[in-house]
């Protein structure tokens, strides 16, 4: 655990706060030791939330553990709407959140649109259960992520919904499209931020 304590010190020394600790691959074969380690690592980093892509069945198994640790887990959604065990539709997300008062949504607005769903109403109705958004521009009908402003996700409406209503939701740029030739991740993230800042101006 000393590695995580060292990382927290580096973050602290540079004025960086860890909001969410992302743990993916949480499957049915996750051991109790691995689950306890996940919580210990998140706490050592000073995170307030664990973010994870997993299934409803795993979320159900985690209920007694999350109650023991009393720590928030925010589940990330994908566009696997044909699998009722996935966090994908509004209904499946809410079904998972109802399992524990410690459960929240890490809503990926790009994937939500790829599932042919509209994020605005879901955010409006469930903002108290959403810790953070993965902000990406996706294409309908199970498409892919594309540069901001070129897909089907109503990004301008999303960020202004948060701004105008003062929702306590963190927005995180998720860079999932391929970098254009001659560009890099730093340049593309800056483009994404510029797009969002202009949208809220």
Predicted regions, residues:
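A generic secondary-structure signal marking the coil-to-beta-strand transition
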Residues: 8, 14-17, 131, 192
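Active-site acidic/histidine proton-transfer and metal-coordination neighborhood
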Residues: 10, 14-107, 113-116
């Amino acid at each position: 655990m000393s590695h995580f304590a060292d990382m927290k010190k580096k973050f602290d020394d540079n004025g960086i706060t860890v909001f969410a600790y992302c743990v993916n691959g949480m499957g049915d074969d996750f051991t109790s030791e691995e689950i306890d380690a996940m919580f210990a690592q998140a706490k050592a980093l000073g995170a307030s939330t664990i973010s994870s892509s997993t299934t409803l069945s795993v979320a159900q198994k985690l209920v007694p553990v999350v109650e023991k640790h009393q720590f928030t887990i925010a589940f990330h959604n994908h566009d696997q709407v044909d699998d009722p065990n996935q966090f994908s539709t509004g209904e499946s997300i809410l079904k998972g959140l109802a399992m524990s008062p410690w459960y929240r949504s890490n809503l990926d607005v790009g994937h939500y649109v790829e599932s042919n769903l509209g994020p605005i109403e879901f955010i409006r109705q469930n903002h108290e259960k959403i810790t953070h958004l993965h902000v990406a521009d996706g294409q309908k009908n199970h498409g892919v992520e594309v540069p901001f402003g070129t897909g089907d996700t109503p990004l301008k409406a999303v960020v202004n919904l948060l701004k105008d209503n003062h929702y306590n939701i963190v927005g995180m740029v998720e860079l999932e499209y391929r970098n254009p030739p001659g560009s890099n991740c730093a340049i593309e993230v800056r483009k994404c931020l510029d797009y969002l800042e202009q949208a809220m101006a």
